[in-house]
Regions:
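N-terminal soluble domains immediately following signal/targeting peptides that reside
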Residues: 25-176
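Bacterial Sec-dependent N-terminal signal peptides
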Residues: 1-32
């Protein structure tokens, strides 16, 4: 279901984004005409946690990890899973910072999933009893593409708020 919704979301965005002719990137992978990542942050009041998921195009994530960490990776096989388990949380922690009610929030890596063309990375922040205001600094993949668009969805007490950031913009504030 999530995959269907995400594809619907991508198709709707594709209709408003300027398309450019980019058939292949430098390593021969098929390029896509827009660069998008979606970060969902849900406050779980009962568990006093923030549940964070990041969805990115697999080839974009693979390319930026290869560039930044000077390695060769293949997300389509299990042979590099331990490298991804180490590199994904390191990269994300450098590109997503959370502040809740004026206090920095640290989060832990739960794991990741590869699904055809997407990677889902999961994180959790503990001991977050309530949220009145959340600031999110999200520069995910801005070091990969200048045209990167980061969509943020934050849900607190059943109320969902969203924002779209186009690099270099990276800061978004949510009040509940």
């Amino acid at each position: 279901m999530a995959l269907i919704l995400f594809k619907w979301f991508l198709i709707s965005w594709a209709s408003v984004l300027p398309l450019r002719q980019v058939p292949f990137d430098e390593v021969g992978k098929t390029a896509h005409p827009f660069y998008l990542a979606v970060t969902e942050i849900n406050h779980n009041a009962a568990a006093k946690t923030l549940e964070i998921s990041c969805k990115m195009f697999a080839d974009d994530l693979e390319s930026i990890l290869e560039k930044n960490y000077r390695t060769t990776l293949d997300i389509t096989t299990d042979k590099d899973k331990s490298q991804f388990d180490r590199l994904i949380p390191d990269y994300v922690s450098k590109h997503i910072a959370l502040t809740v009610d004026g206090k920095p929030v640290k989060y832990n890596f739960i794991g990741f999933e590869y699904d055809k063309e997407s990677v889902y990375a999961y994180f959790e922040a503990e001991q977050v009893a309530g949220v009145s205001k959340m600031d999110v600094n999200n520069s995910m993949l801005c070091d990969f593409q200048d045209e990167q668009i980061n969509i943020l969805h934050v849900t607190v007490n059943g109320k969902r708020k969203s924002n779209r950031l186009v690099c270099p913009a990276s800061l978004s504030s949510f009040s509940f």
